[in-house]
């Protein structure tokens, strides 16, 4: 297929692979294309294709046959995406919140005093 006459949207470098691109990888591997040829067609790095093939390869027939499945690769991608992104600071700051709660409600300190005292003492 000539990329000049393709009706499919071209892959933008730096973006994640779509499910349609994973299906193309599956079909091209079935047809015997090399990883570099697939990368050229999708306009992405050969290492991207290599990582995707490793991520989406399943073992069939008691591990004797390995085959790339687009659905398996996409499911692995979604599972990995759940772990990315900024982590919540709430768990790390729970101790400080207990400190403020104790001194604000029980000792009658203001929020400014709680914050400044904790900073001055270097507790947090």
UniProtKB/Swiss-Prot annotation:
Molecular function, one GO term: transposase activity
GO-annotated biological processes: transposition
Keywords: Plasmid
Gene Ontology cellular component list: cytosol
Keyword check for DNA repair: no
Entry annotated with the keyword Chloroplast: no
Protein name: Uncharacterized 14.4 kDa protein in laf 3'region
